[in-house]
Amino acid sequence: MGAMKPPSRKSCYNFRVTKINRVIDGDTIDVTLDLGFSLTKKERVRIAGVDTPEKRTRDKEEKTLGIDATNWMKEKLTETIKGDEELVIRTELVGGVGKYGRLLGWLYVGDATLSLNEQMITEGYAWAYDGGTKQKNFEELREIRRSFGSLVES
């Protein structure tokens, strides 16, 4: 299955993130959004178009890859906080909420044209996901990460 496509800048809602409260796992984060007029809102965000391995599982292989995906997201968001770049969440959905009540969005840092969502897939930390059946091909992720030199094998 192919990945969902990120919304174009013209057809979406943009939310500026003022604070990253917590990285739950590789595809879910808690943030504080700027709503304008000095109003903010805490929101749980499901990172659109991706599925990462679970870090809370009995499967050791999946758990290791899930922790790696979570750490990758933490690192990217930490870099954003330390720099002068702004983190923006884009969503096409009216209200932006997916089937589990979380904001469903694409994460963009500064003026980047490639979202963090797409980078996760490209660098082998997540599979493309369009809402259908989830895949669990761990070898595919390991191969991509080997090609990037980011896989530490035990």
What is the predicted role of each segment?
Residues 1-154:
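Small beta-barrel nucleic-acid-binding modules, primarily SNase/OB-fold domains
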